[in-house]
Amino acid sequence: KEKYPEVIFVAEVYKKDLYSEYIRTVGFDYLYDKSGLYDTLRTVVEKNADDNGMPVELWQSATGITRNWQFLSDLQPYMLNFLENHDEQRFASDFFGRNAGNTFAPLYVSLFLNTAPFMIYFGEEVGEKGMDEEGFSGRDGRTTIFDWWSVDSIIRLRKVIESGAYRTLNPDELTKDGMTREEAEIFCRFAEAVRLASSDSAIKEGT
């Protein structure tokens, strides 16, 4: 860090009582808030998508979200918020949110709650379901990191990026370049939220 101060170091720390030590003593720039905001939002989503008998006190959104930001206090800017990564099941998979259209409520919380950065996992912005049955991983709601694999939604997204059509945020233009209608609508809504979070000073800087 002393030699290359521009390098950003992110750590996975799953014990919340160690958050402060890893930021203030060890010196990481950001920590995955997996055990905090991610787990809180996941319980809310799963309870609403599939009533699995979870006790009501564990999934009430206002209570859980409030409890997490109060715990973090001045550590909030050092968290890395996310809804998907290589370890967790895809939001739109049958094992989590079941439908990419359900992503927006937790997305808005992750983006707008504080000034912490937000990580986008590839394909999340088009609602990739992660339901392919890959060789090693199998159908587990994740995009494999162990197999030589091709993801159809990513192929379609790449075509849109290469053509420049993504700049329009127009579903009709995106479908012309090969996206499905659902992917195009998810992408536009997702991009609008990210653009707002990165441009509005009240959200970006908390002022």
Model-derived features with residue positions:
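Conserved N-terminal glycine/acidic-rich loop preference
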Residues: 16-37
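Extracellular glycoside hydrolase catalytic/binding regions
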Residues: 30-56, 96-98
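Active-site cleft segment of glycoside hydrolase catalytic domains centered on the general acid/base Glu
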Residues: 1
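Intrinsic-disorder-associated interaction segments
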Residues: 34, 51-58, 72, 179, ...
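Loop/helix patches that line or flank the sugar-binding groove of alpha-linked glycan CAZymes
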Residues: 8, 14-15, 39, 53, ...
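Short, well-ordered coil/turn segments that N-cap beta-strands
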Residues: 4-8, 26-30, 75-80, 114-118
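A general structural signal for short secondary-structure junctions and capping/turn motifs
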Residues: 20-22, 69-74, 109-113, 136-137
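Aromatic-lined glycan-binding groove of carbohydrate-active enzymes
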Residues: 28, 53-88
